[in-house]
């Protein structure tokens, strides 16, 4: 068997997430269906580096899978890209070592989150940016977001009931940019890993700080007390994008 690594992008609107689940359309299942056709009807299991939720998009999701024999990687990429549904794009395919695992190999991830703060909102972007209808002081967000950078226990920013025991993660980039032309906020977070719904919970908290309903020092308190109840609401998944995954050599 030969192992292949692929970078894919997808529009998450019509998917119930990346991971295969019964009675639901998922990214994993769509790609596996194509690979079965390319593998003479034999089953193929696709592994993903990130398990994006329903409605979440990706520019740079990484997957791996095994096929019998060696294939021309560009022909394989073309076949996967053209025979998989139009809301999935196969950006690249390469052959990798048999022990490579896209999820467990050491890597960093970058997420983007788009917030529509236009008045009126842009209805064409309703599936691709989260609309925020309330006033915001962007200087408060810019001040508070810096408290997320560094190595912290992010228990207060993960979904309750998560089975992950070690909730310490390192965030290397936490920034917000205002796109004045589109009237969008673009949040960017890079780090060595993110907990379940962590990015969406951080954005929900930052928006509440920007609206003046939480103090600017609230993030420091959440990190110190590890209390999800101190954080803001979970932002909707439609604004979230898995932008890039970089593996260490």
From Swiss-Prot:
Name by which UniProt lists this protein: tRNA pseudouridine synthase A
EC id: 5.4.99.12
Keyword Hydrolase on entry: no
Subunit relationships: Homodimer.
SUPFAM superfamilies xref list: Pseudouridine synthase (SSF55120)
Binding, substrate: 111
Reaction(s) this enzyme catalyzes, per UniProt: uridine(38/39/40) in tRNA = pseudouridine(38/39/40) in tRNA
Highest taxon of source: Bacteria
Pfam families assigned to the protein according to its UniProt record, in alphabetical order: PseudoU_synth_1 (PF01416)
């Amino acid at each position: 068997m030969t192992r292949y690594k692929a970078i894919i992008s997808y529009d998450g609107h019509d998917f119930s997430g990346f991971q295969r689940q019964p009675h639901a359309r998922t990214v994993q299942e769509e790609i596996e269906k194509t690979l079965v056709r390319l593998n003479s009807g034999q089953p193929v299991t696709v592994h993903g580096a990130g398990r994006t939720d329903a409605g979440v998009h990706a520019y740079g999701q990484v997957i791996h899978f095994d096929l019998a024999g060696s294939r021309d990687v560009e022909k394989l990429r073309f076949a996967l890209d053209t025979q998989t549904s139009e809301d999935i794009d196969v950006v690249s395919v390469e052959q990798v070592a048999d022990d490579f695992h896209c999820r467990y190999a050491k890597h960093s991830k970058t997420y983007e989150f788009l917030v529509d703060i236009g008045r009126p909102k842009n209805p064409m972007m309703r599936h691709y940016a989260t609309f925020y209808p309330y006033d915001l002081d962007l200087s408060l967000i810019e001040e508070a977001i810096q408290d997320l950078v560094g190595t912290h226990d992010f228990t207060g920013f993960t979904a309750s009931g998560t089975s992950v025991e070690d909730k310490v993660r390192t965030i290397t980039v936490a920034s917000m940019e205002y796109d004045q032309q589109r009237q969008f906020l673009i949040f960017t977070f890079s780090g060595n890993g993110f907990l379940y719904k962590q990015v969406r919970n951080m954005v929900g908290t930052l928006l509440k700080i920007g609206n003046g309903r939480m103090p600017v020092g609230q993030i420091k308190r959440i990190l110190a007390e590890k209390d999800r109840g101190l954080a803001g609401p979970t932002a909707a998944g439609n604004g979230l994008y898995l932008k890039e995954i970089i593996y260490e050599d």
